[in-house]
A protein has these predicted regions:
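Polar, enzyme-active/binding microenvironments
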Residues: 1-143, 147-149, 154-170
Length: 171
């Protein structure tokens, strides 16, 4: 869990979905970042931020001065900030990844920016649906989507795992 420069492995049925693009400009640099989200197993999710920086002046210290700043807040809980001191050459692109836990429909806020002058932009969206089969239960004559399946075991209700037999194989 947390920030990385290594892409997580997406499970079958999951894909990167673009959420938004940010753009930050000042008199020394332009930052453009595209934010993607994907669902991982269980309640896990992943973010991908593809960021490009263009420096207007040729001062090599700008790549160290304008630090990368990323943060992911889930369900109103402020996440730990990720900062990186050296971005790379002007015009280069870098990809950052974040993995975390969020229930389907939970609020996710991604903060992308430049730490030195606190120039940031925020993107908010809801966590994607969980992977796996959708189960419907008839309640009062109407079919409703089940958010979880519970099984009574030894007098206590426990969340169960739903499996289906497809062509003789349990999935």
């Amino acid at each position: 869990m947390g920030w990385s420069l290594t892409a997580p492995t997406l499970p079958g049925g999951s894909e990167w979905v673009q959420k938004d693009t940010i753009s930050i400009s000042n008199n020394q640099l332009d930052v453009t970042g595209t934010v993607f989200c994907a669902r991982l197993a269980d309640q896990g999710f992943a973010l991908k931020i593809v960021e490009t920086r263009t420096f207007h002046l040729t001062n090599p210290n700008f790549t160290d001065f304008y630090k990368t700043y990323h943060r992911c807040d889930v369900a109103g809980v402020t996440g730990e900030a990720y900062t990186e001191s050296h971005f790379g050459n002007s015009g280069s692109t870098k990809t950052y990844y974040f993995t975390g836990i969020a229930a389907a429909g939970a609020s996710i806020k991604v903060v992308v920016g430049v730490k030195v002058d606190t120039a940031t932009q925020e993107i908010s969206f809801t966590a994607p649906a969980l992977l796996g089969p959708t189960v419907y239960i008839k309640v009062g004559g109407a079919w409703k989507q089940a958010s979880a399946v519970y099984v009574k075991s030894s007098g206590a209700w426990k969340e169960g795992q739903l499996k289906i037999n497809v062509g003789g194989a349990w999935k």
